[in-house]
């Protein structure tokens, strides 16, 4: 199935409004993403949001690739797996 014809087949989305959230989705063409975030050191001068997650897609070579990541005060830190 081509990307333009893909539909969302699974979706979750939660946000507590206080700095924590998570979401995930999967599409009919095999793309998937999940992410969760949380406020760290709330109320301090070191307050930051830390995000962890992953996404998966099919490359032009037909292989599935998954990128897992952390994003925080140290920047975006991805790791690719195939």
Swiss-Prot record:
PROSITE patterns reported for this sequence: CHIT_BIND_RR_1, CHIT_BIND_RR_2
GO CC entries: chitin-based extracellular matrix
Statement: the UniProt record of this protein carries the keyword Ion transport: no
Keyword set, alphabetical order: Cuticle, Pyrrolidone carboxylic acid
Keyword Ribosomal protein in record: no
MF terms (GO), sorted A to Z: structural constituent of chitin-based larval cuticle
All residue ranges annotated as the Chitin-binding type R&R domain in the record: 18-82
Matches recorded under InterPro entries: CHIT_BIND_RR_consensus, Cuticle_Struct_Prot, Insect_cuticle
Top-level taxon in the UniProt lineage: Eukaryota
Modified residues (Pyrrolidone carboxylic acid): 1
PANTHER family attached to this UniProt entry: ADULT CUTICLE PROTEIN 65AA-RELATED, CUTICLE PROTEIN
Function, in words: Component of the soft endocuticle of desert locust.
Protein name: Endocuticle structural glycoprotein SgAbd-5
Organism whose genome encodes this protein: Schistocerca gregaria
Lineage: Eukaryota, Metazoa, Ecdysozoa, Arthropoda, Hexapoda
